[in-house]
């Protein structure tokens, strides 16, 4: 059991039989009242957020959270197959767990598989990936700076907004956290 006073961002706990990730935790004490710990928790299976206030004397059950480095191999039906780099074991991850992150899967890309109680609950990608632009409208001469953006389709099927000077065939760096353009990469 983990005292709620020790809760930190990134901890995984079990609450009412479900696993939650601590997004935020603040110790709060009003005058002449008991101290509380106010938390924001994310349900690891459903993805919804809740806010919960604990008495400072409470304890919660700590979940077994771990990460394993893996390499993407191929898609099979509605799941994706990864190989654990430590022991070469193959793991199937459902499309529901990946969600729109599937657009960052390139052959042999390395990711971190998040496990809670020996079950894959999430896939963490590198913060930036480099992808090639397969379609975008042509830019105009002189459009080298500015904040005007246009849509571009990338090699994996994802569409991101890019500056006007980006052309078909350019390689760009994309932020996987918010699907945004970062910069053009030299070939």
Curated annotation (Swiss-Prot):
PROSITE patterns xref list: EFP
Cellular location of this protein?
A: Cytoplasm
Q: Which GO terms describe its biological process?
A: peptide biosynthetic process
Q: Which residues form the signal peptide?
A: none
Q: In which pathway does it act?
A: Protein biosynthesis; polypeptide chain elongation
The highest taxon in the source lineage is Bacteria
**Keywords from the UniProt entry:** Cytoplasm, Elongation factor, Protein biosynthesis
Disulfide bridge partners, by residue number: none
InterPro entries attached here? Answer: Elong-fact-P_C, NA-bd_OB-fold, Rib_uL2_dom2, Transl_elong_fac_P/YeiP, Transl_elong_KOW-like, Transl_elong_P/YeiP_cen, Transl_elong_P/YeiP_CS, Transl_elongation_fac_P
Cellular component annotations (GO), alphabetically ordered: cytoplasm
The protein's GO terms of the molecular function aspect are: translation elongation factor activity
Q: Which SMART domains match?
A: EFP (SM01185), Elong-fact-P_C (SM00841)
HAMAP family recorded:
EF_P (MF_00141)
Q: What does this protein do?
A: Involved in peptide bond synthesis. Stimulates efficient translation and peptide-bond synthesis on native or reconstituted 70S ribosomes in vitro. Probably functions indirectly by altering the affinity of the ribosome for aminoacyl-tRNA, thus increasing their reactivity as acceptors for peptidyl transferase.
Family, according to the entry, reads as follows:
Belongs to the elongation factor P family.
Matching PANTHER family, A to Z?
ELONGATION FACTOR P, ELONGATION FACTOR P (EF-P) FAMILY PROTEIN
The name this protein goes by in its record: Elongation factor P
Identify the species of origin.
Brachyspira hyodysenteriae (strain ATCC 49526 / WA1)
């Amino acid at each position: 059991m983990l005292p709620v006073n020790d809760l930190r961002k990134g901890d995984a706990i079990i609450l009412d039989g479900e696993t939650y990730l601590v997004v935020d935790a603040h110790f709060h004490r009003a005058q002449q009242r008991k101290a509380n710990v106010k938390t924001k928790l994310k349900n690891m299976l459903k993805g919804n957020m809740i806010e919960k206030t604990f008495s400072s004397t409470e304890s919660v059950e700590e979940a077994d959270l771990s990460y394993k480095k893996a390499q993407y191999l191929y898609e099979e039906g509605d799941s994706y197959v990864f190989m654990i780099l430590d022991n070469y074991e193959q793991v199937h991850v459902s499309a529901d767990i990946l969600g729109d992150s599937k657009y960052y899967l390139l052959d042999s890309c390395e990711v971190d598989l998040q496990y809670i109680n020996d079950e894959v609950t999430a896939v963490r990608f590198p913060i930036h990936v480099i992808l090639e632009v397969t379609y975008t409208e042509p830019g105009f001469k002189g459009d080298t700076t500015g904040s005007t953006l246009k849509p571009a389709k990338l090699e994996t099927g994802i569409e991101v907004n890019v500056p006007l000077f980006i052309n078909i065939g350019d390689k760009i760096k994309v932020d996987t956290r918010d699907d945004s353009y970062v910069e053009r990469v030299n070939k």
